[in-house]
Each structure stands twice: as structure tokens, then as C-alpha cells.
Amino acid sequence: MADPMGGAGRLPAVFMTPGTSSFTDFLSQSAPHLLPGARGGLPGPVTEVAHGTTIVAVTFPGGVIMAGDRRATQGHMIAQRDVEKVHHADDFSCVGYAGTAGVGAELIRLFQVELEHYEKIEGATLSLDAKANRLAAMVKGNLPMALQGLAVVPLFAGYDPDLDKGRIFSYDIAAAKSEERTYESIGSGSVFAKGSLKKRFRVDLTQDDAVRIAVEALYDAADDDSATGGPDTIRKLYPIVASVTSDGYRRYGDDEVEPVVTAIIADRSTSAGG
């Protein structure tokens, strides 16, 4: 019987064969069963799984802010109160997800490895457009699972050094990619979040202003959508907030987000209409 390891102390031949710089393509050739979309053939639609809810992204001159609530739901139940749905993609981009929590987390981990693998193989980073296209291909690969109820859609944002600005890309479950010029929201509370952003967005926002209206949009979404979690001041659970600028990716600490939440609550206390 042939040794699958190619002999004692040797890597399998697949690791030694020159090929693509895409980790996803490599995985599809060497271990396709590990890809998120390769586990189709379920007996029927799946419903009793945790779902992540609302993500928002807002551009400002020189960068972009992304923020996400912390709630995951399972039917009418709160499955988790401290989910992290906004993540570092690479040094100059971030990604969030809405939909099936397990599939979303797996998709993001694979995307992070995809970008890191390309950089190590090629010695250069992908352009922001190329990163967005790679993510679209991965979303398309999950389509069989999405059609059986395990849908997930990402929101991707980053800093484009060629244009010196932040950019936002959204997707549907069939991997159609759209660039959003100013702001975007995905998830169950997105219609309320976008309504909030529409009222408050300005082209001359400062970075602090962008953080404020992103958190406020999540607050508005939570006010009308039961699947979106608002700031939990008792448990000290606040939205995940990240920025991407020419200085790179930065996640805001809870000690930075808490004063923003406190100011919003104080303002709402004196202006009940929001």
C-alpha cells in the first residue's frame, strides 16, 4: 500500500506540488470535505441553529468603521449574548457576518487563512478588490448549505491605499458582490440600522462621528428588532467596533465603546423620539 505521507518524515506530495496561491483552491484539491460548502446532502432544511444578526459599516474620509451587535438567536431564544461577529481580515481590512453563526465563523477563519496564505506564497498582499472577489468565491461555495437553511452573508470593508479611502462590499447568499459608497448594514436589523444611518450620515464625518453613528444605528436596530442585541450595561457587553485606516486595522476596546454608549443613552433619555 502506498504511504500517504510519501515516506517517513516526508510531507504528502500535494504539499510539494507547485500550484495556486489560493488556500481555498489548495483545500479543494487536497481535502475538499473540509470546505464549508462541501457538507451538503442534509435530509432537509435546518432551523434550530444559532444566528448572528446585525452588522453596520460606515465610511469617513480616510477610512471605514465596522460595528456589530453581540446577540445570537435560535428561533425565539437568545442563544448567546457575547458573540463576536466583526473580525480582523488582514492588516488593512475587516469582515463581519450575519446568518448561521457556526458557518459564518468558519467562513471568516477560512478567509483569514486565504489572505495570509496568498501573502506568504506571493510575498505581496492582494488589492482590496481582489480580497473582495476572493470572499465572493467563498460565499458562492457555501450556496448548497445556504439552500438548506444554513445561510450566511458577510460584510467586508477595508482601506484602499490607491484611492486613500475606506470601501465597503456587501454580498447576497448567491455571492453577488456590491460596493456600497457610504454605509451599509446586513442582518435582521439592517432595515432599521440603515434608516438610522440615512438620517445621520455626512460625507465629512470624523472618525469619532462615524463610531458614534455606527453604534447608534445598532441601538436603533435593537429597539425594533428582537434578534439584535442592544448595549448591555449591566453585563458590560458593548458592540464590537473596529476601524481600518492608512494606519491599519484597530479594534476598539470596551473602555472606548462604553463612553459612546453612555452618551447615546443619555441623549435618548432626554429625547425619547431618538
Curated annotation (Swiss-Prot):
Biological or metabolic pathway of the protein: Protein degradation; proteasomal Pup-dependent pathway
Keyword Cytoplasm in annotation: yes
Keyword Glycoprotein found: no
Primary location recorded for the protein, binned into one broad class: cytoplasm
Documented activity regulation: The formation of the proteasomal ATPase ARC-20S proteasome complex, likely via the docking of the C-termini of ARC into the intersubunit pockets in the alpha-rings, may trigger opening of the gate for substrate entry. Interconversion between the open-gate and close-gate conformations leads to a dynamic regulation of the 20S proteasome proteolysis activity.
Pfam hit, one: Proteasome
Known EC number: 3.4.25.1
Cell compartments where the protein resides: Cytoplasm
Any GO MF annotation of the entry: threonine-type endopeptidase activity
InterPro entries the UniProt entry points to: Ntn_hydrolases_N (IPR029055), Pept_T1A_subB (IPR000243), Proteasome_sua/b (IPR001353), Proteasome_suB-type (IPR023333), PSB_actinobac (IPR022483)
Reactions listed under catalytic activity: Cleavage of peptide bonds with very broad specificity
Keyword list, A-Z: Autocatalytic cleavage, Cytoplasm, Hydrolase, Protease, Proteasome, Threonine protease, Zymogen
Propiece span(s): 1-52
Assembly information from the UniProt record: The 20S proteasome core is composed of 14 alpha and 14 beta subunits that assemble into four stacked heptameric rings, resulting in a barrel-shaped structure. The two inner rings, each composed of seven catalytic beta subunits, are sandwiched by two outer rings, each composed of seven alpha subunits. The catalytic chamber with the active sites is on the inside of the barrel. Has a gated structure, the ends of the cylinder being occluded by the N-termini of the alpha-subunits. Is capped by the proteasome-associated ATPase, ARC.
Family membership noted in the UniProt record: Belongs to the peptidase T1B family.
Role according to the record: Component of the proteasome core, a large protease complex with broad specificity involved in protein degradation.
Name of the protein in question: Proteasome subunit beta
Gene name of the record: prcB
